[in-house]
């Protein structure tokens, strides 16, 4: 993701390159500001929870809500433990505590001066993240690229081989109602091995058709939000797509294709919040980060389980206590009003008539 010339990455099938002082962009500049400014971007707990553990099994392997059986490899919802023993792609997507996530502050690009900000939870202040899960995927940490401002030349990957494998797996399953082990090895297991799973140490990390892992947490969400049932194998195909393509602008279109828009109504949550004493600076010590005094029910808000509620006071009124609205008419786009005026025989798509 962090390349200037797509030709240096054999996985890239279709990409865009930019020319310094001719055609550029501000992606790194905005990414850095959005990752550390009042735009407050961050990954959701829903995404983080979907990453498997290093043994290829979910964080919960049995039981029911309120009494789930926890995977021994899952070390719990602690800032210093949650990302450990997980699918290697998790820490290729989300910052570990102590990693640099910004080198821009007050118009000055200086990695050493600005230091490390993680998680910096104040959802409505400069230098913050709304979820606590800072994104590292796509981030170059390159002072030169930052200083180019609107003339950045980081290449844009539009289509890559990893996505092709995921498309192949999904299409074959939808066509045949199943997937052969050979196809799973060619696609999902190939992606897992490339990511860093150790199949020799953890044989269960290799997906086996007919022996898919149980995931009571995710199955419960699907049962509540979807009006159709999916098999364990299809669940794993969709999981693989979500984690492999995370933060690559594919999720919304995937949900529309799967007729799974109601998954957008799963409450948006962030990391588990404990106390201010858990927030440290970049020294990897117990030194408190004085600059980020976080007050419960004032600068951050949590649910009954202690997880951060995202955008609890959204000025845009898009959320209700961290929950997005959804109506099925949104599976279709509205016909533009000017088209309706030009052709009175056109009928607006249902649900959009008065919007």
Language-model features and meaning:
Residues 28-45, 107-109:
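C-terminal/domain-terminus segments
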Residues 3-30, 61-355:
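Acidic/polar-rich alpha-helix caps and helix-coil junctions
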């Amino acid at each position: 993701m962090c390349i200037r010339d797509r030709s240096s990455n054999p996985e890239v099938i279709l990409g865009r390159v930019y020319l310094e002082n001719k055609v550029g962009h501000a992606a790194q500049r905005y990414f850095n500001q959005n990752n550390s400014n009042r735009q407050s971007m961050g990954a959701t707990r829903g995404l983080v929870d979907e990453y498997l553990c290093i043994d290829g099994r979910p964080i919960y392997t049995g039981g029911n809500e309120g009494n789930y059986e926890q995977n021994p490899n899952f070390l719990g919802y602690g800032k210093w433990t949650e990302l450990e023993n997980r699918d290697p792609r998790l820490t290729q997507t989300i910052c570990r505590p102590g990693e640099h996530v910004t080198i821009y502050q007050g118009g000055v690009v200086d990695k050493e001066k600005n230091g490390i900000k993680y998680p910096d939870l104040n959802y409505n202040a400069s230098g913050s993240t709304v979820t606590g899960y800072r994104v590292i995927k796509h981030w170059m940490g390159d002072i030169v690229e930052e200083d180019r401002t609107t003339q950045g030349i980081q290449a844009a990957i539009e289509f890559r081989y990893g996505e092709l494998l995921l498309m192949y797996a999904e299409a074959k399953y939808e066509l045949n109602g199943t997937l052969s082990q050979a196809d799973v090895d060619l696609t999902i297991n190939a992606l897992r091995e490339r990511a860093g799973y150790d199949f020799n140490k953890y044989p269960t990390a290799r997906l086996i058709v007919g022996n898919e892992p149980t995931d009571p947490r995710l199955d419960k969400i699907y049962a509540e939000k979807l009006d159709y049932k999916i098999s364990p194998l299809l669940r794993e195909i969709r999981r693989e797509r979500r984690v492999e393509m995370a933060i690559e602008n594919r999720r919304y279109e995937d949900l529309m294709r799967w007729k799974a828009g109601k998954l957008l109504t799963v409450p948006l949550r962030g990391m588990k919040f404990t106390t201010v004493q858990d927030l440290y600076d970049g020294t990897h010590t117990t030194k408190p980060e004085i600059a980020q005094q976080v007050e419960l029910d004032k600068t951050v808000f949590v649910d009954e389980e202690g997880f951060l509620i995202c955008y609890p006071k959204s000025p845009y009124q898009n959320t209700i206590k961290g929950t997005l609205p959804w109506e099925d008419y949104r599976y279709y786009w509205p016909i533009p009003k000017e088209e309706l005026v030009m052709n009175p025989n056109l009928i607006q798509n249902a649900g959009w008539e008065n919007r």
